[in-house]
């Protein structure tokens, strides 16, 4: 357990003699939960915005494989982006799940509706693009996503 003695007054990073680590920055997880998403679509409970930004996703199996790779090959003090190869919008993810599970396509709502109903959702899915590279993880961890896109990951479920 990290306690106050592990924190330097001049740094925001923990430190302890003989302990090294790295940081894994995961994309948004998806995978085995797609049946829950399809159920929400059937009840018309999962709207999307028309022009959302691209965000990084990661299939849960790929996240687990990357975590193991980091334990074996990760370099101390390094940060790794654990994301697939193809950024996508939340709308693309939800629409792909709808098609794969034969559920209704999501309702498309204006961003201002999402801002009122779900401010955090609007901030995350409503236009902000967060494109990141997984090149360091691939090179240094000897890892690559089994599902390089949300389309590949959805089809595997």
Regions found by a protein language model. Give the residues of each.
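Amphipathic terminal alpha-helices
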Residues: 148-157
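Conserved C-terminal active-site "lid" loop/helix of NAD(P)H-dependent oxidoreductases
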Residues: 91-95, 115-144
């Amino acid at each position: 357990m990290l306690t106050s003695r592990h924190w330097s007054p001049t740094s925001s990073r923990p430190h302890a003699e003989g302990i090294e680590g790295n940081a894994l920055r995961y994309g948004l997880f998806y995978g085995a939960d797609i049946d829950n998403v399809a159920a929400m679509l059937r009840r018309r409970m999962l709207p999307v915005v028309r022009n959302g930004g691209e965000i990084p996703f990661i299939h849960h199996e790929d996240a687990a494989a990357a975590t193991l790779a980091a334990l074996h090959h990760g370099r101390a003090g390094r940060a790794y982006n654990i994301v697939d190869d193809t950024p996508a919008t939340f709308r693309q993810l939800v629409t792909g799940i709808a098609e794969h599970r034969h559920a209704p396509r999501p309702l498309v709502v204006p961003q201002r509706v999402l801002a009122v109903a779900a401010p955090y959702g609007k901030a995350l899915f409503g236009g902000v693009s967060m494109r990141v590279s997984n090149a360091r993880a691939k090179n240094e961890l000897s890892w690559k996503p089994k599902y390089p896109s949300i389309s590949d990951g959805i089809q595997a479920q």
